[in-house]
């Protein structure tokens, strides 16, 4: 039987609601503020597919630095040119969806809440939050079967996405360190001996920046040509850093006086020695992990996995805005709203790092395991 629904949206209205939802998702997404189209972005956004003999794919291109010394004086340059080495990395894409469904007309009458507006806000927040979780798990080389507090997810939905397997690839040899009393040490905190992990100090921040530069992690060019790095840690990790005596002294004396000083403002980000330090709840930690699955040899040490990020630390296939669909059930008594997005994440790797030209390395991120 044909039905007429005067509340149904036109295609133009649906497009407007979809754009509104994606605006909410982008505004609430933490990782989105670090995304850009160019090679100078921490998260490089790929917004179009590249056609090839294998079909249309989301391709992230990494270009290695030149290795040769060129030609001196009037020596012949022709025939001695150096070929640029470019590495194409394909980002797998998939679709993630969610929906709300109203109980019925009477439930709607009893509520003053606008169903469309609430769905837009709640679904938009959900989408932004899931993008954040997957982005940080990908950069941390951890599977989508985990929550960012180390506990196991209630469902395996995220781990079935086509790009999920790329997240569960261990950090490469020169891109994983942990903090000990002796300083920055190679290897992950999960493989460290019991009792050696330490919390982050001001000295560690300075040494981590030097470690990134020594290992050719390309920083993000700022105004004046200076390179900066982003360092992400948990709120608890930031609290420990703010209690470090050297950190307190430097912020107190180098910062502005009065209530605008970061010690008093309670800011979520602070600049230290060319490193912008951010606290974020979805930086991975082990507080929710079962005993034996935490850090160090016995798996019983609480820790966090900080992320030291330069340019192109993460690739994101961002193919169009989210979409918005509405449907009605039970003779139009129960309206439902669904949203979805096609996207993908990948922590890029390449060969050609001047320190180890033949070794496959994570391109722009170092994992830093510390105690909590």
What kind of feature is each model-predicted range?
Residues 62, 104, 119:
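Glycine-rich, histidine-containing beta strand-loop boundary motifs that form or position
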Residues 92-110:
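Extended, low-charge hydrophobic alpha-helical regions
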Residues 2-22, 109-372:
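Core alpha/beta structural scaffold of self-assembling particle/tube/pore-forming proteins
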Residues 55, 93-95, 226, 332:
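Short, solvent-exposed loop/turn segments at the edges of secondary structure
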Residues 58-61, 101, 230-232:
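Structural recognition of the beta-strand scaffold that forms the well-ordered cores
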Residues 1-93, 353, 358-372:
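N-terminal "assembly arms/tails" that initiate or stabilize quaternary assembly
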């Amino acid at each position: 039987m044909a039905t007429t629904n005067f509340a149904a949206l036109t295609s133009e209205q649906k497009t407007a609601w979809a754009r509104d939802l994606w605006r909410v998702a982008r505004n609430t997404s933490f990782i989105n503020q670090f995304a850009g189209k160019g090679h100078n972005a921490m998260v490089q956004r790929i917004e179009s597919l590249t056609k090839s003999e294998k079909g249309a794919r989301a391709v992230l291109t990494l270009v290695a630095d030149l290795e040769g010394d060129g030609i001196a004086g009037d020596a012949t340059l022709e025939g001695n040119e150096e070929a640029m080495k470019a590495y194409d990395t394909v980002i797998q894409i998939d679709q993630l969806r969610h929906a709300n469904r109203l109980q019925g007309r009477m439930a709607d009458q009893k509520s003053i809440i606008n169903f469309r507006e609430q769905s837009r806000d709640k679904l938009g927040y959900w989408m932004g939050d899931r993008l954040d979780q997957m982005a940080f798990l990908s950069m941390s080389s951890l599977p989508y079967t985990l929550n960012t507090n180390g506990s196991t997810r209630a469902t395996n939905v995220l781990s079935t996405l086509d790009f999920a397997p790329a997240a569960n690839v261990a950090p490469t040899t020169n891109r994983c360190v942990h903090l000990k009393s002796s300083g920055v040490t190679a290897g992950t905190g999960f493989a460290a001996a019991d009792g050696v992990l330490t919390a982050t100090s001001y000295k560690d921040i300075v040494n981590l920046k030097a470690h990134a530069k020594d290992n050719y992690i390309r920083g993000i060019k700022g105004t004046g040509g200076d390179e900066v790095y982003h360092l992400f840690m948990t709120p608890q990790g930031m609290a420990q850093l703010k209690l470090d005596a050297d950190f307190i002294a430097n912020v107190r004396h180098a910062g502005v006086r009065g209530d605008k000083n970061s010690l008093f403002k309670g800011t979520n980000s602070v600049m230290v020695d060319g490193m912008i330090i951010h606290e974020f709840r979805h930086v991975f930690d082990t507080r929710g992990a079962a005993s034996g699955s935490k850090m160090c040899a016995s798996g019983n040490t609480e820790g966090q996995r900080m992320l030291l990020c330069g340019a192109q630390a993460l690739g994101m296939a961002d193919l169009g805005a989210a979409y918005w669909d509405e449907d009605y059930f039970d003779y139009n008594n129960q309206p439902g709203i669904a949203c979805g997005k096609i996207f993908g994440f990948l922590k890029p790797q390449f060969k050609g790092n001047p320190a180890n030209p033949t070794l496959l390395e994570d391109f722009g991120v170092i994992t830093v395991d510390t105690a909590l």
